[in-house]
Amino acid sequence: MRSQTIIGRCGSTGLKPAVCLVLVETLIALFLPVFHPSTSVNAQEKAPLKLIATTPSPGFSGDFDHFAVDLKGNRLFLAAEDHKTVEVFDLRTGKSLHSIAGFGQPHAILFLPDTNKLIVTDGDDFGRVALVDGKSYEVLDTIKLPPGVDGAIFNPQTKDYYVESGGGTGAATHLLNIIDAKNFKHVGDITLPGNHSEAMAVDRAGKKLYVNLTGTNEVGVVDLATRQLISRWPVPNAKVENSMVLDESNHRLFIATRQPPTFFVFDTDTGKVVTSLPCAAFNDDMWFDRPRKRIYATGSETTTVIQQRDADHYEHVAEVPTGYRAKTSILVPELNRLYVAVSGKGKPDAKLALQIFQIQP
């Protein structure tokens, strides 16, 4: 259409249309290669994340859930919850190495480098955690838990693994099952309000646990010594809070909700919201890049990048394109990389894949 317009204007000068067409095509051939690639390069250089590798996952459907990393063994683990497997990738290249079967619906993964073992949470209308050999990839043992096993968080100080379970539609309470990761034993439970919870964070001392009480639209604070809920902070005008990161040095807690997609900053001393910003839809994982003071929240189609200016001020700096339901991610600061899993639930033609992004200065 633009070429026809130019030809028409050119024709008004007295030149024949055929001559004008040759001139237009020549100009396009000369200038498009010069300007278009340089614009793309500049955009990539300015972006906070640069896609450096993609590993397609043909034959997979449904959702991925959470990652785990084995730095020494150069492995990346990914829970393929609807495929009923844990996938193993080369951490540096993204190459697929192995598929661990034997699960019903795997969710969270804890890698134990001292013993080269994994603990995998597994459940929906059932519940268990599985201990997996990191060499043979065989399931060595399981612990039965209430139905609805889902997310989990590890306390490196006590070596306890807190696993969400129980609840369900209409339930008044649910549980955090405490698994002694060193001895692989169920050693206790913490009762939480509402029918379920999502992401959690533990302070450096291993004394407090923060949890998204998604069933009641609150953030909960648990005293890990007494195993009691000691505070409940309402999430204003939003619900389905999924992601969480703790910035302990600034006394700040970051969470992200899905309805609407919003990033919140809480003051951990007061339980009050400091500020909020829009973020990626259908978010599930979020990470704090401490050296660069950046937050990465992964959701469907994009990763939101937010810059922390100081404890109270935050700036939305980018929406980095990813893929459909690309909500699952892990930050590996040792490699300056963000790994993202593109899912496919509800979309028959979805192209599931592992994406590797290099963090830019």
Predicted regions and their residues:
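N-terminal secretory signal peptides that target proteins for export/translocation
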Residues: M1-A18
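Sensor of tandemly repeated, compositionally biased sequence architecture
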Residues: Q4, V34-N42
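Generic short N-terminal amphipathic or hydrophobic helices
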Residues: T5-I6, L27, S329
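Generic alpha-helical structural signal
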Residues: R9, A18, P37-S38, D63
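Bacterial N-terminal signal peptides
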Residues: A18-P37
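Predominantly soluble domains enriched in secretory-pathway, periplasmic, or organellar proteins
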Residues: T39-P361
